[in-house]
Amino acid sequence: MVILGIDPGTAICGYGLIEVQGNRLSALAYGAVRTPAHTSQASRLQTIFTDLEAIIATYRPTHVAVEELFFNRNVTTALTVGQARGVILLAAARAGLSVHEYKPSQVKQAVVGYGRAEKQQVQQMVRVLLALEEIPKPDDVADALAVAICCAHSLTWGVACR
């Protein structure tokens, strides 16, 4: 099973692909879709959509896991991230993929064992669980891998991400 985890964003959209073989998780590929600040929102969304379609075509994941929108005080940021989530969900739907959505607290619970874990704790566990030499950067990439790990725990071992 191959899971594509995504941490939505318009400037940086992190992605991480993991493979699940029995009890073993391994990172296949990870990175970030970056969009220039000076471009229109429509252009940024098109870049995210096009790049994710290419990633899906290349790695052929069986599932897509997306972090749910965490509403913050900046409504404008929440709206633009919501738009990014929309094109991400569209890319997954066009490929006929099963989409799983998780709250940040669910991801932290699945990866660290504590739903209010610090970002550094999550990043360190991503490195350990996937046997990576270094913590993936930028943070959005480690977050995307964490979402994929949460999905793997949920689908493979029936662990409810609470």
Curated annotation (Swiss-Prot):
Biological processes, Gene Ontology terms: DNA recombination; DNA repair
Top-level enzyme category: hydrolase
Subunit architecture: Homodimer which binds Holliday junction (HJ) DNA. The HJ becomes 2-fold symmetrical on binding to RuvC with unstacked arms; it has a different conformation from HJ DNA in complex with RuvA. In the full resolvosome a probable DNA-RuvA(4)-RuvB(12)-RuvC(2) complex forms which resolves the HJ.
Required cofactor names: Mg(2+)
GO CC, alphabetical: cytoplasm; Holliday junction resolvase complex
Catalytic activity as recorded in UniProt: Endonucleolytic cleavage at a junction such as a reciprocal single-stranded crossover between two homologous DNA duplexes (Holliday junction)
InterPro entries: RNaseH-like_sf (IPR012337), RNaseH_sf (IPR036397), X-over_junc_endoDNase_Mg_BS (IPR020563), X-over_junc_endoDNase_RuvC (IPR002176)
Keywords, alphabetical: Cytoplasm, DNA damage, DNA recombination, DNA repair, DNA-binding, Endonuclease, Hydrolase, Magnesium, Metal-binding, Nuclease
Note describing how the cofactor binds: Binds 2 Mg(2+) ion per subunit.
Protein name listed in UniProt: Crossover junction endodeoxyribonuclease RuvC
Source organism of this protein record: Heliobacterium modesticaldum (strain ATCC 51547 / Ice1)
Cited function: The RuvA-RuvB-RuvC complex processes Holliday junction (HJ) DNA during genetic recombination and DNA repair. Endonuclease that resolves HJ intermediates. Cleaves cruciform DNA by making single-stranded nicks across the HJ at symmetrical positions within the homologous arms, yielding a 5'-phosphate and a 3'-hydroxyl group; requires a central core of homology in the junction. The consensus cleavage sequence is 5'-(A/T)TT(C/G)-3'. Cleavage occurs on the 3'-side of the TT dinucleotide at the point of strand exchange.
PANTHER family per the UniProt record, alphabetical: CROSSOVER JUNCTION ENDODEOXYRIBONUCLEASE RUVC
UniProt-listed HAMAP family: RuvC
Residues annotated for Mg(2+) 2 binding in this entry: E67
Residues annotated as binding Mg(2+) 1: D7, D140
